[in-house]
UniProtKB/Swiss-Prot annotation:
It comes from Escherichia coli (strain K12). GO terms for biological process: response to hydroperoxide. Pfam families: H2O2_YaaD (PF03883). This is DNA-binding and peroxide stress resistance protein YaaA. One of its GO terms (cellular component) is cytosol. It is found in: Cytoplasm. Keywords: Cytoplasm, DNA-binding, Stress response. The lineage of its organism: Bacteria, Pseudomonadati, Pseudomonadota, Gammaproteobacteria, Enterobacterales. Induction: Induced by H(2)O(2), via OxyR.
Length: 258
């Protein structure tokens, strides 16, 4: 079973590390090509392209400039500990045991605009380059054209290595669009999280993102290997709704807190 999640815009390079083990990203040659393109952008161009403030654009221009191909614990940190968004609040990787990290390293992958695919312990230098950004490059008009089949092929390698054919899609649509489902040697299961609001169940972005992290943690902590085991997920009040679920889509609901 291979879990896919999105990266986060918020990064943490200050907190104490809970493991000293690390690996290196497997697609750095591609990352270096994107950095070459990104370095051509001025801060105002970055601001327009990413729809971010001038201050953030300046920070990210500096990150592109400072990025170097030699990754060490001195200039990078493990991806699963560097990302700090809503998904990672639910995941709480900073509390993982070494055995948890081992399982995650085999069964969890983070999709990334710059790095393509990251394993949890892969070192990562700070960046911001969302998958949906239209950064022109030698391979096309955006990052989807840049990555082509590369991400899908890397995921197929991971599936083959564990002798499995199930992908748990906990990534956002923006990121999963970088995967070619028809070329993926796997059955794709997509958990959906609905929260009650004024008597109706719907996807509420903040809660749904955190729930994706909670589900990832549930799989890792319990060493789950079969998709049917996911129906036991009950973190923070969620429950499986079989009637609303269908082939390939598992629906979890949570009542409004009153």
């Amino acid at each position: 079973m291979l879990i896919l999640i999105s990266p986060a815009k918020t990064l943490d390079y200050q907190s104490p590390l809970t493991t000293t083990r690390y690996t290196l990203p497997e697609l750095l040659d591609n990352s270096q090509q994107l950095i070459h393109e990104a370095r051509k952008l001025t801060p105002p161009q970055i601001s327009t392209l990413m729809r971010i403030s001038d201050k953030l654009a300046g920070i990210n221009a500096a990150r592109f400039h400072d990025w170097q191909p030699d990754f060490t614990p001195a200039n990078a940190r493990q991806a699963i500990l560097a990302f700090k968004g809503d998904v990672y609040t639910g995941l709480q990787a900073e509390t993982f045991s070494e055995d948890d990290f081992d399982f995650a390293q085999q069964h969890l992958r983070m999709l990334s605009g710059l790095y393509g695919v990251l394993r949890p312990l892969d070192l990562m230098q700070p960046y911001r380059l969302e998958m949906g950004i239209r950064l022109e490059n030698a391979r096309g008009k955006d990052l989807y054209q840049f990555w082509g089949d590369i991400i899908t092929n890397k995921l197929n390698e991971a599936l083959a290595a564990q002798g499995d054919n199930v992908v748990i899609n906990l990534a956002s649509d923006e990121y999963f669009k970088s995967v070619k489902p028809k070329k993926l040697n796997a059955e794709i299961i997509k958990p959906v999280f609905l929260d009650e609001k004024n008597g109706k169940f719907k996807i509420i972005s903040f809660y749904a993102k955190k729930a994706r992290g909670l589900m990832s943690r549930f799989i890792i902590e319990n060493r789950l290997t079969k998709p049917e085991q996911l129906t036991g997920f009950n973190s923070e009040g969620y429950f499986f709704d079989e009637d609303s679920s269908s082939n390939g889509e598992l629906v979890f609901k949570r009542y409004e807190q009153r």
